[in-house]
Amino acid sequence: MITEDKAYDILALNQTATPEEILARYQTLKDQYKKIKEETKDLKTQLAYQLKQIELDDVFIYLRTCQKI
């Protein structure tokens, strides 16, 4: 379950981050995870980054629900 503290930890931001900073960090991480997942041939790494992408999407949904973004 995502909490506010965990959401900011996953994004590596502090809780004073602006909505613009949150969205920028989300998009940066999303792009990085996608690139790593696509470039690796190792199935275990692909699955790990798939889980990271899902977790990142959960953070986005949580913060949107809390009206932080």
Regions found by a protein language model. Name each.
Residues M1-L51, E55-K68:
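N-terminal J-domain/J-like co-chaperone modules of DnaJ/Hsp40 proteins
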